[in-house]
Amino acid sequence: MVANETKQSQELAKRLWAIANDLRGNMNAAKFQNYILGVIFYRYLSEHTENYMDDLLKNDGISYQEALADPDYTETVKEWSLEHLGYIMEPKNLWGALIDSIKAGQFSIEDFEKAINALVGSTVGQDSEAAFYKLFDDMNLQDKDLGREVSGRTELISKVMLRVNDIPFGVTEAEIDVLGTAYMYLIALFADDAGKKGGEYFTPTCASTLVARLATVGLDEIASACDPCAGSASLLLEVKKHLGKQKVGHYYAQELNGSTYNLLRMNLLMHGVPYKEFTTYNDDTLRVDNFDKKKTEQFTVQVSNPPYSLKWAACLLYTSDAADE
């Protein structure tokens, strides 16, 4: 079963990688990854929302889209979505609606931008705000590299969305494993393409598997797992994979690079980790010890693959840090 899932994930990742290579043109692969990964992630959120809410409403004989349009259901559905998913997706912003708009020749890249802003905006002031704050910022839909005019940018992003839409991937509990793993493989392919710098945000599977197994020897489930140099969360997710579903109570992670920090949160969500079950920080672990607040609740497991190759300068802050002594 595991071997079959791995094969499916690898094949899915290869197809997505082919899309990236076909459509990025002269754009740097490291930059184009923000668009392909962002589009895949948006599709996941949309289809996960519909699947989750439709299942919830099936006994009422009404779909998610119908419920949002029905005054008797609207507020309840929105409150439930915010509480359990962390965000609200309006029917017009669902993946299927955007694809229909593209096929009808009525789509503009500005529609996609508004849809993303609406999703992130729905989390403001909610418990989920930190999980979604500026999550799509690296997917700059106004970037001139996509096209000098709105029409050019619309044409390219439409091609990306249509090609991604042609690839079947599911969002049921079983299918999320395949999709999440494919997402990891795709991140790995971009990391390989980036060369040495790719190691800053992705730990090779063989290394992360070994670390996860060593860190959890004798443990069947854990209250928490922490990675202070999390990158794209590959180590934490390997711990999740090794222990099994619902065996990790909470994930803690910190990552300095802003783009990688966004990828970290996307990756956790893509692997079915609810926003309530992870706490992340976008900071320098050596300079800003956000984990100091957690000293009263020791982490069960800590894993890390620090960026050893990065240059760093001596700082007086470090001389008084017990961790450096």
Where are these regions (language model features)?
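Short, flexible, mixed-charge acidic loops at enzyme active sites
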Residues: 313-317
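Conserved small/polar residues in nucleotide/adenosyl-binding loops
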Residues: 318-325
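Non-catalytic, mostly N-terminal accessory regions of nucleic-acid modification and defense proteins
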Residues: 1-210, 214-215, 282-285
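Conserved S-adenosyl-L-methionine
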Residues: 197-304, 309-311
